[in-house]
C-alpha cells in the first residue's frame, strides 16, 4: 500500500544557478523552521542535492524543483528534480582519494540520510531523493 498523501508539503521551482542552489538551502531552512523540524541534517542534504542539480543537471532555460514533504510519521522526504534524466548519479565508492576537492556530495548525502535514491522520469527529468527521520516537536 502506498504512503498516504503528505501532511506537510513544500514545492518550489528554482533557477539552475548557484543563486538558485543557495535559495533552495535558505527556503528549506525557513520551511523547516515553520514546521518546527530540526534544520540539520536536512539543510545539508538540500544544499548537496541542489548543488548537484546546478552542476550536473543544468539545461539552459530550465529550472530544478525542490520538494520537502513529511511522508510518514517523523520522516522528512527531500526531493530535487532536474531536467537531465540522461545523467543519473552513480552510487560509487569514493574514488577521488583523501585529497580530492569535489565529488563527495552524494557520499555525504548517503551518510546523512536514512535512505536515498534516484527516480527516472517523467522524460526528460530525474529526481534525487533522500529521507531523514526526526523527533516530533511534541517529543523534544
PLM-predicted stretches and their roles:
Residues 1-41:
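Bergerat-fold GHKL ATPase/HATPase_c domain
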Residues 37-61:
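Conserved ATP-binding N-box helix of the HATPase_c
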